[in-house]
Amino acid sequence: GTEEAKKVLRQHRIEKLPLMQDGRLRGLMTTKDIKRLEQWPDACRDEKGRLRVGAAIGVKDTLDRARELVSAGVDVLVLDVAHAHSEIVIQRLKELKANFKVDIMVGNIATAEAAKDLIEAGADGLKVGIGPSQVCSTRIISGAGVPQLTAIMDVVAVAKEYGVPVTADGGLKYPGDLVKAIGAGAN
């Protein structure tokens, strides 16, 4: 653990600690690494201690971009479109699930029906929010959208049945908005 590593670094007055496994060098741990681990103990890391990385992709050139991102080591792909409850998004999601072994989050949506359709197509996570923020005009231009708190509750009602996490995307202007989103069931 980190306490043992700190002890070895101090004892030998060194700044880098080689990490060995089966007689082979697997990495180095520095005092800065230990400080980061202590400062952000809840950071989302993979089994090698690296921060997890997600990358957004759209519906154009989806497979090519996804292939490059997955080969670079991305942990999650986010199929990110303004209004994700559409045939093209469902089709791209199915293609991604058939070709890659990473989690795929899909959004943005605002209804229980969208949640059900995307989960059944393979979504591992959902992003909720169509036009709830000041910079997004999707709801105004398209006429499609639901107030953020209602959208979260509607999507969570379905996602919970499948064990799929929900992320509130937008509409979080004041500290109380985050509390409301979590209270409505967003992860």
Question: Locations of the language-model features?
Answer:
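Glycine-rich beta-to-alpha transition loops that act as phosphate-gripper elements at the mouths
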Residues: 1, 20, 55-61, 105-114, ...
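The conserved cystathionine-beta-synthase
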Residues: 1-13, 20-21, 36-38, 60-70
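Alpha/beta catalytic cores of nucleotide-metabolism and tRNA/nucleoside-modifying enzymes
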Residues: 3, 7, 101, 121, ...
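Active-site-adjacent beta->alpha loops and helix N-cap segments on the catalytic face
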Residues: 24-44, 61-65, 81-103, 109-120, ...
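Short beta-strand/loop segments at the ligand-binding rim of alpha/beta enzyme cores
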Residues: 46-55, 95-110, 125, 158-170
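Conserved, mostly hydrophobic/aromatic
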Residues: 53, 79, 126, 155, ...
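Catalytic cores of alpha/beta
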Residues: 64-72, 110-128, 168, 172-187
